[in-house]
């Protein structure tokens, strides 16, 4: 028997599908940033923790997803697709994978929207978190740098699989049945990466002049937010990305298991960037603001890996023009463009050299192995010790020859001459005379007093002790041979024992009376 979907259930279902689509885009894009994500669990979820997952939304990605959806939801014949592609510094591009969220006409009228659909969408989103990290594009995203970057594009409509080449494979993340149709989340990914293996990349300037990590906090929280050169300022444009609280509706539904409806604090520690109206014809990078350098009007402060800043040119260099409708998501791991905060004159020189991009490999290795103490203070490399380094990198620590010479484990001190009575038998004249050195240089006598030893003359090791006491000798009380005494001998001695008892019967009676 088919049941009609109530207006409240329909409203909840549309809200579930809407935010599932937005969270799907966030999960896919964040999995291609090239960085590991570590999120701590919270016992008090906020109203934006949809599907019981604490996924920090990137405002720019949410803005692009909402712009692609344009108020419509994935339905029969309307699919939402997220295309992941690769672009090199020479301008060559290659599509890597396409994620598709679609719906078919198979309905489940008996399923409950308020509980079952919501929980199954949560499980599907968790499956997506795992699947996005097993496809080949994830490994490429972890290695992106100045040679290539990973781009993404969101579109709504028919799935375009022509760019994946021949022999691409598909994987279905999962399906969730609803009263209006069955949601299906799948992925088609490229397996022929010959383009990457045959081309020899050269050291070139970065593709984008502004390369920012999505997960680095602002080094100067008190400074005013900066704006990329492709965007207008907030006063000129008058349009800004909405914050997390504004971009997401509170997760309130008709059932009691929804998260609380109050947002206590902001989920993100950085200020959102501003979208410029005058650059609509240009492809713009998805970046996060970190602070404005007032001294250099054409340079931007970019947060580095160590919490420092790097001065990067605001205008794109060679190969900076990205494809329209594609957004770059990249943070370089190369040490030539990531330096510590200029706290001294030497650090300032390092920042200027790294911004030019002409650092030698030796300088790169030296920068990597410089130990940082405190926030951004550099410790001289000759002060690096094995104990101050992490365990996996202790083997790469520079060895100090003077310390090795004084180490008693490397060069043990000379042992004193022993007076053991066995000394003469162990060291013969022939063995010591042939070497030309003293006898104690060839042999080191150690007073060996093991445990479980009977005496000092006959030492006993643990194995001998264990074997000896594992099979102990029989007790003397158990060694009497009772079989030698026969029953006849017992009967012959019985009259004698009775006669002795009758003779001393009075003594026995007196003893018994004393006991009473």
Curated annotation (Swiss-Prot):
It comes from the Eukaryota. InterPro entries: ATG13, Atg13_N, HORMA_dom_sf. GO terms for biological process: autophagosome assembly; mitophagy; negative regulation of cell population proliferation; positive regulation of autophagy; response to mitochondrial depolarisation. Phosphorylated by ULK1, ULK2 and mTOR. Phosphorylation status depends on nutrient-rich conditions; dephosphorylated during starvation or following treatment with rapamycin. ULK1-mediated phosphorylation of ATG13 at Ser-354 is required for efficient clearance of depolarized mitochondria. GO terms for cellular component: Atg1/ULK1 kinase complex; cytosol; mitochondrion; phagophore assembly site; phagophore assembly site membrane. The modification Phosphoserine is found at residues 354-355, 360. A motif (LIR) lies at residues 443-446. Keywords: Acetylation, Autophagy, Cytoplasm, Phosphoprotein. PANTHER family: AUTOPHAGY-RELATED PROTEIN 13, PTHR13430. The LIR motif (LC3-interacting region) is required for the interaction with the ATG8 family proteins GABARAP, GABARAPL, GABARAPL2, and MAP1LC3A. Part of a complex consisting of ATG13, ULK1 and RB1CC1. Interacts with ATG101. Interacts with ULK1 (via C-terminus); this interaction is increased in the absence of TMEM39A. Interacts with ULK2 (via C-terminus). Interacts (via the LIR motif) with GABARAP, GABARAPL and GABARAPL2. Interacts (via the LIR motif) with MAP1LC3A, MAP1LC3B and MAP1LC3C. Interacts with TAB2 and TAB3. Interacts with C9orf72. Interacts with RB1CC1; this interaction is increased in the absence of TMEM39A. Autophagy factor required for autophagosome formation and mitophagy. Target of the TOR kinase signaling pathway that regulates autophagy through the control of the phosphorylation status of ATG13 and ULK1, and the regulation of the ATG13-ULK1-RB1CC1 complex. Through its regulation of ULK1 activity, plays a role in the regulation of the kinase activity of mTORC1 and cell proliferation. This is Autophagy-related protein 13. It comes from Mus musculus (Mouse).
